[in-house]
């Protein structure tokens, strides 16, 4: 039961972060999953596990959220990924739900070019640590 709850909390927190990113009005909305064939942005959560568990069963769960982007214009892509990192790590308040709250977002991996496709689209990757408090 608690594994299902944690997955639900993590999914809700990731969707909330995606909503923050989509509010930045970048060249594309961000979607969960893999990059498509055209220009775009995607995110997906990596391995998560509680960082701390307290006697009252509250937990801090650091999510490793991978952000990938693809665009045929390197400057457009670089500005978008950098805007995501700057905007989310500088926020003073974060979304919350009934049993969870994002308490901090930091850069885990700086944005970097990881390749260029045959279609001449650049691919960039980065990741954020999204720290979520649960069972508030």
Q: What does each model-identified segment do?
A:
Residues 46, 65-66, 103-106:
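Intrinsically disordered, low-complexity regions of eukaryotic proteins
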Residues 53-60, 116-121:
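Short, solvent-exposed beta-strand/turn "edge" segments of beta-rich domains on protein surfaces
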